[in-house]
Amino acid sequence: VYDAYRPQSAVDHFVRWAEDLEDTAMQPCFYPEEEKSRLFAHGYIAARSGHSRGSTVDLTLLDEASGKELDMGGTFDYFGAPSHTDYDGLTPEQRANRALLRDAMLRHGFRGIKTEWWHFTLQEEPFPDTYFDFPVRAPD
Protein backbone atom coordinates (compact mmCIF):
# COMPACT_ATOMS: atom_id res chain seq x y z
CA VAL A 1 0.00 0.00 0.00
CA TYR A 2 1.46 3.32 -1.09
CA ASP A 3 -1.24 5.59 0.30
CA ALA A 4 -4.65 5.26 1.93
CA TYR A 5 -6.32 7.78 4.25
CA ARG A 6 -4.95 11.29 3.67
CA PRO A 7 -6.11 14.20 5.85
CA GLN A 8 -7.74 17.08 3.97
CA SER A 9 -4.96 19.34 5.26
CA ALA A 10 -2.45 17.18 3.33
CA VAL A 11 -4.57 17.52 0.18
CA ASP A 12 -4.63 21.28 0.77
CA HIS A 13 -0.82 21.20 0.92
CA PHE A 14 -0.68 19.38 -2.46
CA VAL A 15 -2.98 22.03 -3.91
CA ARG A 16 -0.75 24.86 -2.63
CA TRP A 17 2.29 23.09 -4.08
CA ALA A 18 0.59 22.63 -7.46
CA GLU A 19 -0.46 26.28 -7.56
CA ASP A 20 3.15 27.40 -6.97
CA LEU A 21 4.32 27.27 -10.57
CA GLU A 22 7.82 28.39 -9.58
CA ASP A 23 8.43 25.21 -7.53
CA THR A 24 9.42 22.66 -10.17
CA ALA A 25 12.00 20.71 -8.15
CA MET A 26 10.00 17.48 -8.44
CA GLN A 27 9.29 17.77 -12.17
CA PRO A 28 12.13 15.48 -13.34
CA CYS A 29 10.90 12.66 -11.09
CA PHE A 30 7.13 12.93 -11.13
CA TYR A 31 5.93 14.94 -14.13
CA PRO A 32 8.70 15.41 -16.72
CA GLU A 33 6.24 15.29 -19.64
CA GLU A 34 3.69 17.66 -18.09
CA GLU A 35 3.54 21.38 -17.48
CA LYS A 36 2.88 21.98 -13.80
CA SER A 37 0.13 24.43 -14.77
CA ARG A 38 -1.79 21.51 -16.36
CA LEU A 39 -1.74 19.11 -13.36
CA PHE A 40 -5.24 20.18 -12.25
CA ALA A 41 -6.71 20.10 -15.77
CA HIS A 42 -5.30 16.62 -16.40
CA GLY A 43 -6.72 15.30 -13.13
CA TYR A 44 -3.48 14.61 -11.28
CA ILE A 45 -4.18 17.11 -8.49
CA ALA A 46 -7.62 18.01 -7.09
CA ALA A 47 -8.90 20.07 -4.17
CA ARG A 48 -10.91 17.07 -2.94
CA SER A 49 -9.74 13.47 -2.75
CA GLY A 50 -11.29 10.10 -2.03
CA HIS A 51 -8.26 9.54 0.17
CA SER A 52 -9.69 12.12 2.60
CA ARG A 53 -12.99 10.25 2.66
CA GLY A 54 -11.13 7.14 3.82
CA SER A 55 -12.34 5.18 0.81
CA THR A 56 -9.41 5.34 -1.61
CA VAL A 57 -6.18 3.38 -1.64
CA ASP A 58 -3.07 3.50 -3.83
CA LEU A 59 -1.38 0.13 -4.06
CA THR A 60 0.47 -2.45 -6.11
CA LEU A 61 1.07 -6.19 -5.98
CA LEU A 62 4.09 -8.05 -4.67
CA ASP A 63 5.60 -11.32 -5.82
CA GLU A 64 4.92 -13.70 -2.93
CA ALA A 65 8.24 -15.54 -3.22
CA SER A 66 10.58 -12.55 -3.56
CA GLY A 67 8.56 -9.85 -1.84
CA LYS A 68 9.35 -7.51 -4.74
CA GLU A 69 6.81 -5.36 -6.53
CA LEU A 70 5.42 -6.74 -9.77
CA ASP A 71 6.43 -4.76 -12.85
CA MET A 72 3.50 -2.48 -13.61
CA GLY A 73 5.28 -0.54 -16.34
CA GLY A 74 5.42 2.67 -14.38
CA THR A 75 6.12 4.12 -10.98
CA PHE A 76 3.69 5.27 -8.31
CA ASP A 77 2.72 8.96 -8.43
CA TYR A 78 4.13 9.54 -11.91
CA PHE A 79 1.97 12.16 -13.63
CA GLY A 80 1.99 11.11 -17.26
CA ALA A 81 0.91 8.65 -19.93
CA PRO A 82 2.82 5.61 -18.56
CA SER A 83 0.56 5.76 -15.48
CA HIS A 84 -2.64 5.60 -17.52
CA THR A 85 -4.38 2.24 -17.29
CA ASP A 86 -4.60 1.95 -21.08
CA TYR A 87 -1.00 3.02 -21.83
CA ASP A 88 0.14 1.54 -25.17
CA GLY A 89 3.80 1.19 -24.20
CA LEU A 90 3.31 -1.74 -21.82
CA THR A 91 4.81 -5.17 -22.30
CA PRO A 92 2.44 -8.15 -22.16
CA GLU A 93 3.71 -8.94 -18.64
CA GLN A 94 3.09 -5.38 -17.42
CA ARG A 95 -0.38 -5.37 -18.97
CA ALA A 96 -1.15 -8.72 -17.27
CA ASN A 97 0.12 -7.42 -13.91
CA ARG A 98 -2.09 -4.33 -14.14
CA ALA A 99 -5.05 -6.51 -15.09
CA LEU A 100 -4.39 -8.79 -12.11
CA LEU A 101 -4.46 -5.81 -9.74
CA ARG A 102 -7.51 -4.23 -11.39
CA ASP A 103 -9.49 -7.47 -11.43
CA ALA A 104 -8.72 -8.21 -7.77
CA MET A 105 -9.82 -4.74 -6.74
CA LEU A 106 -13.00 -4.89 -8.84
CA ARG A 107 -13.89 -8.25 -7.26
CA HIS A 108 -13.65 -6.62 -3.86
CA GLY A 109 -15.82 -3.60 -4.64
CA PHE A 110 -13.29 -1.00 -5.79
CA ARG A 111 -13.12 0.96 -9.04
CA GLY A 112 -10.05 2.44 -10.66
CA ILE A 113 -9.40 5.63 -12.60
CA LYS A 114 -7.95 5.99 -16.09
CA THR A 115 -4.96 8.15 -15.17
CA GLU A 116 -3.42 6.10 -12.32
CA TRP A 117 -3.05 2.30 -12.48
CA TRP A 118 -2.52 2.15 -8.66
CA HIS A 119 -5.56 4.22 -7.54
CA PHE A 120 -8.80 2.53 -6.40
CA THR A 121 -11.90 3.83 -4.62
CA LEU A 122 -14.50 1.79 -2.78
CA GLN A 123 -17.66 1.82 -4.92
CA GLU A 124 -20.04 1.93 -1.96
CA GLU A 125 -18.34 4.58 0.12
CA PRO A 126 -19.60 4.92 3.70
CA PHE A 127 -18.84 8.70 3.76
CA PRO A 128 -19.16 9.91 0.14
CA ASP A 129 -19.62 13.57 1.07
CA THR A 130 -17.27 13.86 4.05
CA TYR A 131 -13.63 14.93 3.81
CA PHE A 132 -11.91 14.05 7.08
CA ASP A 133 -9.01 15.99 8.52
CA PHE A 134 -7.89 14.06 11.57
CA PRO A 135 -4.11 13.72 11.87
CA VAL A 136 -2.19 10.51 11.32
CA ARG A 137 0.63 9.79 13.72
CA ALA A 138 3.23 7.04 13.76
CA PRO A 139 2.98 4.74 16.77
CA ASP A 140 5.39 5.43 19.62
For the regions a protein language model found, what residue spans apply to each?
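Cell-envelope/glycan interface and biosynthesis
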Residues: 1-139
